[in-house]
A protein has these predicted regions:
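Aromatic-lined carbohydrate-recognition surfaces of secreted/lumenal glycan-active proteins
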Residues: 121, 125-139
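Repeat-associated, polar segments at repeat-unit boundaries in modular proteins
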Residues: 253-275
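Structural recognition of alpha->loop->beta junctions
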Residues: 81-96, 101, 141-167
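Disulfide-bonded cysteine-rich modules in secreted/extracellular proteins
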Residues: 222-240, 269-279
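Substrate-binding cleft of extracellular glycoside hydrolase catalytic domains
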Residues: 1-118, 122-126
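Extracytoplasmic Gram-positive cell-surface binding/anchoring modules and repeats
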Residues: 234-247, 255-257
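Functionally critical loop-and-helix segments that line ligand-binding/catalytic clefts
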Residues: 1-18, 145-222
Length: 279
């Protein structure tokens, strides 16, 4: 099912989240902070987090890195700052590294910084992703072939998304109009049920679902091995984690990670073809 969302920051001023909810918005990605003007927390982060939560709108967050985030050390430092801002909060959508400021000439360094950022966030228990434009971001500023383990939020203001890789959210306009928000707002679509994946997986401040808790002392019944198709569906439902965690868990369970991931990629591409023509 396609879900319509928005992404916001202090630029949208004071938002009436109840009106936003009534306008049919089903999720929001909120700016938490950045490093493009020194380390800072977005001035509307707390108000937007509390307002969206109170209105019952599932949320994610993003962190805008500066032009100097072109080393692994810088990526790790930005992630640690992001973690500080997110402490004590629960988010139903991924937490994103926003790569827009780094120059194309620093592509290799930006890629290293991005991997370090994402690994730091993953190690802290977050479902992490990367934001970038379909062309100038993932093609010119980053080596996207090294970033496939992480969720992608792709920006392309057009009637369809031409990005060829796997992505979870498409930002299709910067000139949306939504009741409760003064002026223009970025608009997004997703076909991924991130809230279920994140809550059941115990990411982003949530406790892992009780049914997936392995602390019971009662021996588990022996079950037959699952097919690749069955495993791929479970991966899509968030039952095998994300990134390196997914690979380790599938391998430890005796399954062929490469075969399962190939099936997942095929399913995601099929879903993306549908998403790319949504507007």
């Amino acid at each position: 099912m396609t879900r319509k969302g928005i992404d916001v920051s202090h630029w949208q001023g004071t938002i009436d989240w109840n009106k936003v909810k009534k306008a049919g918005i089903e999720f929001a990605i909120i700016k938490a902070g950045g490093s493009d003007a020194g380390f800072y927390t977005d001035s509307k982060w707390e108000a937007n987090y509390k307002g969206a939560k109170a209105a019952g709108i599932p949320i994610g967050a993003y962190y805008f890195v500066g032009k100097d985030c072109v080393t692994a050390a810088a990526g790790k430092a930005d992630a640690e700052r992001f973690l500080h801002i997110l402490k004590g909060k629960q988010l139903e959508y991924p937490v994103y590294m926003d790569n827009e400021a780094q120059p194309a000439s620093a592509k290799a360094g930006t890629t290293e910084a991005t991997i370090a950022f994402c690994k730091t966030m993953e190690d802290a228990g977050y479902f992490v992703g990367i934001y970038g434009s379909a062309v100038s971001g993932f093609k010119e500023r980053m080596d996207d072939t090294k970033l496939t383990p992480y969720a992608h939020w792709v920006a392309q203001y057009a009637s369809k998304c031409s990005y060829k890789g796997d992505y979870g959210i498409w930002q299709y306009s910067s000139k949306g109009s939504v009741d409760g928000i003064n002026g223009n707002v970025d608009m997004d679509y997703t076909l991924v049920d991130y809230p279920t994946i994140i809550r059941s997986g115990g990411f982003n401040g949530y406790t892992k679902a009780a049914y997936d808790d392995n602390t019971s002392t009662t021996p588990a019944p022996v079950t037959p091995a699952k097919t690749v198709d069955e495993l791929a569906k479970e991966v899509m439902d968030g039952k095998w984690g994300n990134g390196t965690d997914r690979k380790e868990r599938l391998t430890a369970a005796g399954y062929d990670y490469s075969a399962v991931q190939a099936k997942v990629n095929a399913l995601v591409k099929s879903r993306n073809r549908l998403l790319s023509t949504t507007p």
